[in-house]
UniProtKB/Swiss-Prot annotation:
EC number, as in UniProt: 2.7.7.4
GO biological process: hydrogen sulfide biosynthetic process; sulfate assimilation
Region (Disordered): 281-300
Protein's name in the database: Sulfate adenylyltransferase subunit 2
Catalysed reactions, semicolon-separated: sulfate + ATP + H(+) = adenosine 5'-phosphosulfate + diphosphate
Top EC category: transferase
Organism field: Brucella abortus (strain 2308)
One Pfam family of this chain: PAPS_reduct
Alphabetized Gene3D superfamilies for the sequence: HUPs
GO molecular function per UniProt: ATP binding; sulfate adenylyltransferase (ATP) activity
Amino acid sequence: MKNLTHLQRLEAEAIYVFREVAATFSNPVMLYSVGKDSSVMLHLAMKAFYPAPPPFPFLHVDTTWKFREMIEFRDAQAREKGFELLVHVNEQGVRDGIGPFTHGSNVHTHIMKTVGLRQALDKYRFDAAFGGARRDEEKSRAKERIFSFRNAQHGWDPKNQRPEMWKIYNTRVSKGESIRVFPLSNWTELDIWQYILQENIPIVPLYFAARRPVVERDGMLIMVDDDRMKLRPGEPVENRLVRFRTLGCYPLTGAIPSSAANLSDIVEEMLIARTSERQGRAIDRDEAGSMEKKKREGYF
């Protein structure tokens, strides 16, 4: 038996996790945020159950502020791959006019993402939800298990996690409780890009460098994606060569100057990167420990 490469080991672990959840939970779902990690997750899920389709639906929590290219890519992938796509919007948040400009990143994220996700999980009664979080992304995620227990209110208690020795997972939950499952926990950002290159996985074009209209605000390059973008007095819009390392709501996601226009260029760029991909996410700057607080409340 030949020795597995690093990427093959990561792939095998993720596929094992997918199959374990399918075998032990009655109503799982995959959270599909449309980013690079979600694209890798989709690819792995298709592999795990081939030639059958994944035995669970894909859930996208739409904040109504995602990049337009993300929504176009999401719908195109659903048509091409033929998976069941569920889209949920917190309609009460829409009626209340919640948005990143009017209410700030913290309130917007809580109402439109966290509360929206909890609504969808309750509506469809999912008992397990796959997510694309990785331990190298952020310190609160670094201490989270692959199988992350959530109580009936979808809350996470980092001091009450289940042991995962020898790849043996405790999948038992009581009524109303659930598990968030992270098959990519042991992957790094570089692993993700090398796997995307190796497998030729389709991704949102925003990850590739192109000239885009951006404004420099609070140390971030924010792309002007539609006419809802509120410019400050004297704030110029510049067409700059940029790409995104991470994707989310466009007013809360910063681009980076880059000329990496293909996958090989991105991998080369990642080999010398010395900053976190989440430096471009405004939601991580809300307050100290903000990500852990969000996760305790039921965030992805």
